[in-house]
């Protein structure tokens, strides 16, 4: 089990990127959250099986027809054993 914090730069807001991220996470049974930041980046924390997580990150980095990822900053985080779902966060609150 592994957890990472990711900041994604590029054309990633207003193009359905958070929904794409959520779909790909759920498809791989990953948990965590994703949200838009005021600076135009998308931020997320994701955890799960290490191979599923790597496949998820590779897929996210490739983007979509509308979302273009320029750069991803990835840092390890402590695993949260209490987390059971992957959700889209709205606003600045958790």
Swiss-Prot record:
It catalyses: an acyl phosphate + H2O = a carboxylate + phosphate + H(+). Gene3D superfamilies: 3.30.70.100. PANTHER family: ACYLPHOSPHATASE (PTHR47268:SF4). Keywords: Hydrolase. InterPro entries: Acylphosphatase, Acylphosphatase-like_dom, Acylphosphatase-like_dom_sf, Acylphosphatase_CS. The keyword Hydrolase applies. Belongs to the acylphosphatase family. Residues 3-90 form the Acylphosphatase-like domain. Coiled coil: none annotated. Its EC number is 3.6.1.7. It comes from Geobacillus kaustophilus (strain HTA426). This is Acylphosphatase. It is an enzyme of class 3 (hydrolase). Pfam families: Acylphosphatase. One of its GO terms (molecular function) is acylphosphatase activity. The active site is at 18, 36. The keyword Hydrolase applies.
């Amino acid at each position: 089990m592994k957890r990472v914090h990711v900041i994604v730069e590029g054309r990633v807001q207003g193009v359905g990127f958070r929904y794409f991220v959520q779909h790909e996470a759920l498809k791989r049974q990953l948990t965590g959250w994703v949200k838009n930041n005021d600076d135009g980046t998308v931020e997320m924390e994701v955890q799960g099986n290490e191979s599923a997580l790597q496949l998820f990150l590779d897929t996210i980095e490739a983007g979509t027809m509308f979302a273009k990822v320029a750069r991803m900053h990835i840092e390890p985080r402590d695993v949260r054993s209490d987390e059971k779902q992957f959700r889209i966060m709205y606003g600045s609150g958790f």
